[in-house]
Structure formats: structure tokens, C-alpha cells
Curated annotation (Swiss-Prot):
Name of the protein described by the UniProt record: UPF0225 protein YchJ
Similarity annotation: Belongs to the UPF0225 family.
Chain segments annotated as transmembrane: none
Domain of life: Bacteria
Disulfide bonding pattern of the chain: none
PANTHER family: ADENYLATE CYCLASE-ASSOCIATED CAP C-TERMINAL DOMAIN-CONTAINING PROTEIN, UPF0225 PROTEIN SCO1677
Lineage of the species this protein comes from: Bacteria, Pseudomonadati, Pseudomonadota, Gammaproteobacteria, Enterobacterales
Pfam families tied to this protein: SEC-C, YchJ_M-like
Signal peptide positions (record): none
SUPFAM superfamilies membership: NTF2-like, Sec-C motif
């Protein structure tokens, strides 16, 4: 039996993010790039993360930091809860929750990532981390309060 993709799509990894991470295909949209980048974190693939960061971001300088982070972070799951495009389809946004453990503590990254399409290729630019009140509904869509879900 084949392994399911870590991106949470419920599709086999070989049919989902693998072709993007291994350069067999180019991610067709920001959501696929976001999911494949999450897989690269899970698989500890700094090369793919750097390759898919926009060149203006200078991501190659972050290689040592990325690799160091791999050693003590275990990724637990990804939930994409929104994606949209702007500027004629050349700028995209993906909002997600990525759960992890680090140093024995569970955490979550909640981010709205920004992507740019240049020469037929999508690149990660940056992300913003919205602030949520403890009693706000969790953005992951669970129906729980933030403090009882991703805010723990």
C-alpha cells in the first residue's frame, strides 16, 4: 500500500506532491505549491523549499536555519482553509494551519501565504500571521474556539 501524501489531500504521495517536489511537474497554482512546500518540510527537503521561494527573498541564506529546524520539528498535519488569486491570476494567497511538535511541545502555524507567478512558475513570497482571540472561532474550520483547537 502506498503512503498518503503528508499534505492532507487523502491522495497517495506519488500522485499528489511527489511530482512537484522531485521536479517532474510545476505546481499549477498556489495551493499545490503550498501543499508541496509543506511536504518538503515533512521530508526535510531544503533544496525544494529554497527553489520555490521567490529569488528576491534570498532564501539560499536560510539553508542552515532550515536544516537546523528539521532536526527538532515533527510536522503533524496541514489544513488549507482558503485560497484565492489576484492581479489577473499572478498573485495568489493560501491560508492554512500547519501543526507540529517541537521540543516536546505542540504548536501550530496559522498563516496567509502570498505567492507570485513569474514565467509560468509559482513562488512563495512571504506570509502574514493573523491574530486570533482565544474565544474566536478557530480558522481551521473545526467549529471549536481557537483556545481549544489550534491556539493550544
Amino acid at each position: 500500500m502506498s503512503q498518503l501524501c503528508p499534505c492532507g489531500s487523502a491522495v497517495e504521495y506519488s500522485l499528489c506532491c511527489h511530482p512537484y517536489v522531485f521536479g517532474e511537474k510545476v505546481a499549477p497554482d498556489p495551493e499545490h505549491l503550498m501543499r508541496s512546500r509543506y511536504c518538503a518540510f515533512v521530508m526535510q527537503d531544503a533544496d525544494y523549499l529554497i527553489k520555490t521561494w521567490h529569488p528576491s527573498c534570498g532564501a539560499a541564506a536560510l539553508r542552515a536555519e532550515l536544516i537546523a529546524g528539521f532536526a527538532h520539528t515533527e510536522w503533524l498535519g496541514l489544513t488549507v482553509f482558503e485560497h484565492c488569486w489576484q492581479d489577473g491570476g499572478n498573485i495568489g494567497f493560501v491560508s492554512f494551519v500547519a501543526r507540529f511538535t517541537e521540543g516536546g511541545k505542540t504548536g501550530a502555524i496559522i498563516e496567509r501565504s502570498r505567492f507570485l507567478k513569474e514565467n509560468g512558475q509559482w513562488y512563495y513570497i512571504d506570509g502574514t500571521r493573523p491574530q486570533f482571540g482565544r474565544n474566536d472561532p478557530c480558522p481551521c474550520g473545526s467549529g471549536k474556539k481557537f483556545k481549544k483547537c489550534c491556539g493550544q
